[in-house]
Amino acid sequence: AAERLLDETNAWLGIHPLEAWPVVGTPDSEQRFVAYSQWLTASGAPADVVQELSARQRRRSRHFTEQRVTRELEDGAYLPLPGRKLRVVWTPGHTAGHICIADEDHEILFTGDHVLPTIHPNIGAFADRPDADTLGGYLASLEKLAPWGEYQICPGHEYHFRGLAERSAQLRARLAGRLEEVAAARAAQPDATPWEITAGLRWRRGWDALENTDREDALAATRAHLNHIDHTDPTKSAN
C-alpha cells in the first residue's frame, strides 16, 4: 500500500531512523529468519512451535516489499508541512522507532500504538532486540508525553479521548502488577525458561487456549518484563 501511494501521489514515507530496519530492510533475508528461529529456541519454545512459527514467518515475508523511506523523522523535529506545527515525539517501547505526533496548533496528540483508550499495547523483546529493556523505554516514553497531557488523544486504534495522565497511570499500574507476577514466577522457578515462565502466568483466555501466534506475543512480553528486571536489578540472573 505504501509503495502504491508513493508511486501514484506526492506522498512521502517518513519514519524514525530506528524504525528503518524492519520497514526498509529485506524481510525475506535468511539472516533474519535464522535470528527469529534462534530467538524462539533460546526462549525455550518447543521444537514443533519453532518450526510452525518459523514457517509462518517465511510465508508472511512474501507479502512484504522493500519500502522507500523518503524522510527520517528525528525526535523534536517538525513535519515539513507548510502552515502546520506537527512535532515528532520519539516514544520507543512498542517498537524501537515508534513516534507520536503533536499537533501544537490544534492541541491534538496522535499516539499511534503507544497509548490506546482501552487496549494495552504489546511491549515485547522480539528477535530484533531480544535483550533490550523495551519495557523501561516504554515507561520512560509515557512520562515523556506529560507536556501534552491536556491535548486530545488520537490513537492508532479504537477512538479519540482525553485524559492522558489518567490513562498513562492505568498503563503503568498494570505493567507494575505484571512485573510483580513475572518476578515471583522467576523466583519460584529460577531455572525456568522464558517460555515456561510465560506458560505459568495468568492469561485472560488461558495459556492452553492461545494459538501459537498469540503465544509468541506473550513470550515477547514476558521477555520484556524479564529484561526490565535484569536492567533495573543487576542481582537478578538473566534467563
Please give the residue ranges for each predicted region.
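Active-site HxH/HxHxD metal-binding segment of metal-dependent hydrolases
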Residues: 1-80, 169
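Feature marks short, surface-exposed loop/turn motifs that line or immediately flank catalytic pockets
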Residues: 21, 118, 162, 201, ...
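C-terminal helical/coil "lid" or tail adjacent to the Rossmann-like core of SAM-dependent
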Residues: 30-34, 168-182, 204-210
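Metallo-beta-lactamase
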Residues: 52, 58-68, 78, 85-179
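C-terminal regulatory/interaction regions
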Residues: 181-239
